[in-house]
């Protein structure tokens, strides 16, 4: 068992934001994914107040010691997330952690209150 901010988790492994698309994985593997879900909680891709296309290519640069990426947080925006993604994410068998990003304190507050 593990605990994160007062939430009990089955184990200490959760995905990093944007690294695992649970909706696409469920389409590929069906409900079997829910029976053997690999993470103790699911962290969404970043949700912003308004939809974002993300950065134009190139989005990835190779360096001698690794890679730098600048994807630009493409997402459907709050309304799109609530209508399209949240119902699917809410059906996952683990706690949901929504990653939000605002361009002002007011936007962050609006996003946080939308999920509170």
Please state what every model-predicted region is.
Residues 1-95, 102-103:
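N-terminal capping/small domains of soluble enzymes
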Residues 108-115:
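Distinct, well-ordered alpha-helical segments
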